[in-house]
Amino acid sequence: DVEYEQRYQAALSLFNKRQYRAAIEQFEALVAANPNHSLADNAQYWIGECYYLLGDYRAAILAFEKVFTFKNSNKNEDAQYKLGLCYYNLKDRERARQEFQTFIDNYKNSKLIRKAEEYLARL
């Protein structure tokens, strides 16, 4: 519905202004209000991005993992890549290796494939 989309755009605007904590609150409210809305998976993804940019990689991991609970999400690819980056930044080499390998196996045509392969080569 229109109101949900307006609230989503407002939350995205906060993200773009680097007001990540405020954006997290707004995105979480959207997911809670209607987890079946077509933008709910995107809202969940942006929660992960906010935490990632705040340097809270553990919270980002939890948020990105929730993206996969949404059916047919268009954010699965990006969430999988970001999981690799989160573990990489946490210096968890084994888990980062797993996540990047999963990304490479599942998203062979991704524009991020080369970057994922570069990270994997560093591990």
Regions picked out by a protein language model, each given a short descriptive name:
Residues 33-39, 69-75, 104-114:
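Short solvent-exposed coil/turn linkers within tandem alpha-helical repeat scaffolds
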